[in-house]
Amino acid sequence: MNKKYFVLIVCIIFTSALFPTFSSVTAAQGEAVIATDEMNVRSGPGLSYGITAEVKKGERYPILKEDGDWVQIQLGSGEKGWVVSWLITKEDQASTSSSGSSDTVTSTDPDLRMRSGPGTSYEVIGKFPQGSQASVIDKDSGWIKISYHSATGWVSSEYVTSGGSSSASDESDQTEDSGASTTGTVGVSSLNVRASASHDAAIITKLDRGTKLTVLNEKNGWAHIEVNGLKGWVASHYLLTSSVPADDSANAGSSSSAKKAYIMYGGTNLRSDASTSASIVERAAKGDSYTITGSKGSWYEIKLDNGQTAYVANWVVQTSKSAEEAGEPPVSDSPSGNGSLNNKTIIVDPGHGGKDSGTIGYSGKFEKNLTIKTAKLLASKLRSAGADVYVTRQDDTFVSLQSRVSTSHYRNADAFISIHYDSYADTSTRGSTAYYYSPAKDQELASDVHSEVVKRSSIPDRGVLFGDYYVLRENRQPAMLYELGYVSHPQEEAIVHSNSYQEKVTDGIESGLEKYFQ
């Protein structure tokens, strides 16, 4: 009998010793990335449990286990705690480690500041010098969280390049410059020099007004320049160029007394009258120039190549007449209040993503890939018009509905636009539909935007309707959800995927937002 009791006690001790080991082995289930500004960590899976810690946006913690809408995480202190699942982004541990090992950025700014959060309002915690490399931890709407010299912080994505360091000279070596160079003078207060001929390229340095430089080559509205031994690319319409020595460039530039309007953003609308509701006569490309023949409020009257008169908003052009009058960026020399989108915070929400493919089109294409295409094009146009734009997902990742709404609240959005495409079992169904939830808060936004889109769209108008969608119902900010066509309809699927349609609907949404904010 005593021997049996002894064996039983040994078994109990052995089993007890196994439990912690078993728990730690099965614990790893990826990482939780905090998706809201601040979040409470609780001692158990529910709001009734006590708060034990607080975590901040962008921080990462190993996931231990899940219980309904709650996730248990491993804190850095060795403690464990529970957080709500809809305020985190889950990342697979394998993909996180593989991307982390190769995803690096290089600073292109000699004085790039690291901040405690993704925005200029956050505290400066250090510097990321030009040429230095760092590992990427997270990304958020134009900001990148990096690990640099054992410190972590956020830097603006505008001043870093992906991967190893590259310089403008590396880029320029691949360009065949013409033998005949010209001299030029910077005609704006601050001119970005970029690593390649693109507005998406990294900024290498900035040049002040009046800086003399050599123009080596020009292509597609960009000038390949050299200044003080540094080579790079600048938008050519910001330069006053001449084949005479640089000292005489101001005189050469003043030979034309007619004041010109230089288009700063691709796809700028030229209208029949001085109003965003006026019909569009023509769309101008970035760098196009027109003679200014008059003004009307905050609009310039311009003369088109065919002799016709049109109007362009003065906040989307640069004007120049001589070196002394080379136009400032429009925000700085436009009167206060010009441009209804200026400084408006707009959330662009591409529906679905990651494991959520959305609907599947007639040809088998996923909705999630089309929504982000539309969202990125729209965001680019809204930024060009002066808006502060945040996109809820930048790539093919899953973002919860709660996180999308949380972004709207956190950014105190002036407007939230959720982009979707529709489908139906009856493949003859087609058309675009704008949805709102609150008549008082949302309906005007949906109506203004939809009215401008249908002017440009070639597909049927299904109207502005009430929609009980989470991103509308739970959103405290003005919000709309846009179904921009039926991908279950074979012809309409081809239409909505076309570049022409994408340009038209994003133009319409931009114009509708301008109308809404007037």
Swiss-Prot record:
Comp. bias intervals (Polar residues): 333-345
Compositionally skewed regions (Low complexity) per UniProt: 95-108, 160-169
Keywords: Cell wall, Cell wall biogenesis/degradation, Hydrolase, Metal-binding, Secreted, Signal, Zinc
Class of enzymatic activity (EC top level): hydrolase
Matching Pfam families: Amidase_3, SH3_3
Domain named SH3b: residues: 29-91, 102-164, 181-243, 258-320
Catalytically driven reaction(s): Hydrolyzes the link between N-acetylmuramoyl residues and L-amino acid residues in certain cell-wall glycopeptides
Keyword Metal-binding: yes
Gene Ontology biological process terms in this record: cell wall organization; peptidoglycan catabolic process
Region Disordered, residue ranges: 94-121, 160-186, 322-352
Domain MurNAc-LAA, chain residue ranges per copy: 346-514
Subcellular location: Secreted, Cell wall
Enzyme Commission number: 3.5.1.28
Domain of life: Bacteria
InterPro entries: Bact_Sporulation_Assoc, MurNAc-LAA_cat, N-acetylmuramoyl-L-ala_amidase, SH3-like_bac-type
An annotated Gene Ontology molecular function: metal ion binding
Parts forming coiled coils: none
One cellular-component annotation, GO: extracellular region
Signal peptide, first to last residue: 1-27
Family: Belongs to the N-acetylmuramoyl-L-alanine amidase 3 family.
Function: Probably involved in cell-wall metabolism.
Protein name: Putative N-acetylmuramoyl-L-alanine amidase YrvJ
Organism of origin: Bacillus subtilis (strain 168)
Gene this protein is translated from: yrvJ
